[in-house]
Design a protein with these regions (language model features):
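Interaction modules related to DNA damage response and DNA replication/repair
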Residues: 84-88
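Class I S-adenosyl-L-methionine-dependent methyltransferase catalytic core
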Residues: 1, 5-11, 21, 60, ...
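Non-catalytic nucleic-acid substrate-recognition regions in nucleic-acid-modifying enzymes
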Residues: 1-79
């Protein structure tokens, strides 16, 4: 759960790990009584002809709150303020999030589209073991800047999972891979989900067939050294060389790997804007590096 200063409805619908966003009314202690007191002072009856509903959630059962009771009592506050209730098709929905010792109240603004299951790796025309799930691929594509009007490049595109999600988010996408098998498979997968706006070529990530400053963002999942062929490079040389090429063609890059490559990224000319880990299963933790062009 996080708080943002500004909300963009169209971007919210493309998010991966965020399910919904609300316009914050306020925050208080994680009790139903405190939530009702906050709501009573926050609502003013404006747009009182618009129907409402309440949805409460106890995040990971961390607050010990009876959410049905919370919905009932918060709904009573809204009725007393003059709002008609419609549980089936409300004009507005109040969200109450209880987490730990806090409660946040807000009017729902937008929900992200949860259709990732329709693009599961095993359901694509071309599949290889170890392919990234669509939910994670969308998150990393978003970090790279995937959006309408943007061009995203994956220099190690494999089966095309990252490019599919960047394309579904509205981007033009370019893929490069050293193996013809992957190039053909990626093209087949992209054609299954995107009408147009994609190109895939065989090439070397350390010598990209792309002009300087030609794309808006780069995103790639580096070989893990276990199931991936690395062609004629050592893994270290491949990752560093690809990062150098990424810095030539784009101002932003997202690198996903099974280890920390922050020092290599800095050597290749990038500034590490953020890094975090995401556990996939017991033997794999992904290291995600968000890289920005170095200034000054």
């Amino acid at each position: 759960m996080g708080v943002a200063r500004r909300l963009d409805d169209s971007r919210l619908r493309r998010l991966a790990y965020t399910r919904a966003a609300s316009r914050l009314l306020g925050r208080t202690d994680a009790t139903v009584g405190s939530a009702c007191e906050l709501l009573a002072t926050a609502v003013d009856g404006v747009d009182g002809d618009r129907t409402v509903a309440v949805h409460a959630r106890d995040v990971r059962s961390s607050a010990g709150v009876d959410t049905e009771r919370a919905e009932r009592l918060l709904g009573r506050v809204l009725v007393e303020a003059g709002y008609p209730v419609d549980l089936d098709d409300p004009d507005r929905e109040l969200r109450a999030l209880f987490t730990g010792d806090r409660c946040l109240l807000g009017w729902l603004v937008a929900e992200s589209v949860r259709d990732f299951g329709t693009r599961a790796p095993t359901d694509r025309p071309f599949f290889q073991p170890g392919s990234m799930v669509s939910l994670d691929a969308r998150a990393y594509a978003n970090l790279a800047g995937a959006a309408p009007g943007q061009t995203i490049l994956d220099p190690m595109c494999g089966t095309g999972g990252l490019l599919i999600e960047a394309g579904v988010a509205g981007s033009q996408v370019i893929g490069v891979d050293a193996q013809w098998k992957m190039v053909r498979g990626s093209r087949e997968n992209l054609a299954a989900y995107l009408d147009d706006g994609f190109r895939v070529a065989r090439g070397d990530g350390t010598r990209l067939p792309v002009p300087t400053d030609a794309v808006d963002g780069v995103v790639f999942d580096a070989p893990y050294g276990r199931q991936s062929k690395i062609a004629n490079h050592t893994l270290d040389d491949l990752v560093e060389g690809t990062l150098r090429e990424a810095a030539r063609v784009a101002p932003r890059c997202v690198l996903i790997a099974d280890r920390d490559w922050s020092e290599t990224a800095a050597t290749a000319g990038w500034q590490v804007d953020a890094s975090f880990e995401r556990r996939v299963h017991g033997s794999l933790v992904r290291h995600v590096h968000v890289l920005e062009e170095r200034t000054g």
